[in-house]
UniProtKB/Swiss-Prot annotation:
The lineage of its organism: Bacteria, Bacillati, Bacillota, Bacilli, Lactobacillales. Its main location: cytoplasm. InterPro entries: DUF896. Residues 58-85 are annotated as: Disordered. The keyword Cytoplasm applies. This is UPF0291 protein SSA_1878. Keywords: Cytoplasm. It holds the Pfam family DUF896.
């Protein structure tokens, strides 16, 4: 997210505590917060989808649900053509 938008979120939060927000500012704050949260969720999802879990012996123990997502996206050499990947 653009640093200017984050600064605006913080500015509105501070103003809300000190003097309150107008109706327009409340709408703007909600919109900015939703945009921030969506970006955060996207980032976390991308990070988790890129994880490959291995045990002490080097065996891939990635949960099947995550493996399926990785197959769909072609991550870690996984492929929909090879269900064992």
């Amino acid at each position: 997210m653009d640093p200017k938008k984050i600064a605006r979120i913080n500015e509105l939060a501070k103003k809300k505590k000190t003097e309150g927000l107008t109706a327009e500012e409340k709408v703007e704050q909600a919109k900015l917060r939703e945009e921030y949260i969506e970006g955060y969720r996207r980032s976390v999802r991308h990070h988790i989808e890129g994880i490959k879990i291995v045990d002490e012996d080097g065996n891939d123990v990635t949960p099947e649900k995550l493996r399926q997502v990785q197959r769909e996206k072609g991550l870690h050499g996984r492929s929909l053509d090879d269900p064992e990947s």
